[in-house]
């Protein structure tokens, strides 16, 4: 296994158990629902993972595109949501077929750390093309340079304490310490960005950047950014 894409195309130990997984996806779905601008909105969740509660997001918008690079994940999305006319599960290369300037909101949660800078810049160009004037790109769970695995572990344990899965979270952290995740993280690494770096990257891609007051999900040591597409009517 030589890439993060290969790693995610399988059942992984990243979740300590079913309760952890459910609470994670529920929290993210609730956060995304809060970002949907209107019932008529078109939304793209890029790098969505299994998106267990995507139907709740779809109920708040007109169309929800779910895109993930892992074939196994897409199979599960199709099995779970194939009968929902508001939801379409796409491979990353199919996102290019979405009409330009047709999307109101793009959410990219916990993906940047697995991309090279060149990959990120290429995707930003794609996302910018798909967004309408006045649309927003929300890039979440960005890891700052000063956040360590220990900080992430503390955030998980706090989430587990409040979510009622502390015992399984402790066991999960022990498993992760000896898992492929740790080996790949050491060999390939995770991309980390400062706030200033993210602002520069978003501006270079044609967005007006903003730091969100809180991160999507449970880990508030990480960052969420909003890239605004200027609306000529507001100029």
What role is predicted for each listed range?
Residues 110-111:
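Short catalytic micro-motifs in class I SAM-dependent methyltransferases
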Residues 121-133:
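A short glycine-rich, Lys/Arg-flanked "PGG" loop and its adjoining helix->strand segment in the class I
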Residues 1-36, 40, 50-85, 91-97, ...:
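Class I (Rossmann-like) S-adenosyl-L-methionine-dependent methyltransferase catalytic domain
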Residues 116-117:
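Helix-capping/helix-break motifs at membrane-protein junctions
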Residues 107:
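A conserved beta-strand element that flanks and buttresses the S-adenosyl-L-methionine
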Residues 46:
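Conserved beta-strand/loop positions that form the S-adenosyl-L-methionine
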Residues 42, 63, 102-104:
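Structural signature of beta-strand start/N-cap positions in the alpha/beta core
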């Amino acid at each position: 296994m030589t890439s993060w894409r290969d790693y995610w195309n399988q059942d992984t130990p990243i979740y300590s158990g079913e309760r952890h997984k459910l609470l994670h996806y529920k929290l993210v779905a609730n956060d995304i629902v809060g970002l949907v601008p209107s019932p008529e909105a078109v939304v793209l969740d890029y790098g969505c993972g299994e998106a267990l509660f995507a139907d709740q997001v779809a109920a708040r918008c007109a169309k929800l595109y779910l895109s993930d690079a892992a074939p196994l994940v897409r199979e599960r999305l199709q099995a779970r949501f194939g009968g929902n006319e508001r939801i379409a599960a796409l491979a990353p290369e199919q996102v290019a077929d979405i009409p330009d300037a047709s999307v109101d909101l793009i959410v990219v949660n916990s993906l940047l750390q697995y991309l090279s800078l060149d990959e990120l810049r290429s995707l930003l160009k794609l996302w910018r093309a798909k967004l309408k004037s006045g649309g927003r790109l929300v890039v979440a769970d960005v890891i700052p340079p000063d956040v360590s695995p220990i900080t992430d572990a503390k955030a998980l344990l706090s989430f587990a304490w409040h979510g009622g899965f502390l015992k399984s979270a402790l066991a999960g952290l022990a498993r992760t310490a000896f898992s492929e995740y740790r080996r790949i993280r050491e060999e390939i690494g995770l991309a980390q960005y400062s706030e200033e770096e993210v602002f520069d990257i978003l501006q270079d891609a044609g967005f007006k950047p903003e730091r969100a007051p809180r991160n999507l999900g449970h880990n508030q040591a990480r960052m969420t950014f909003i890239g605004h597409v200027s609306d000529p009517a507001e100029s």
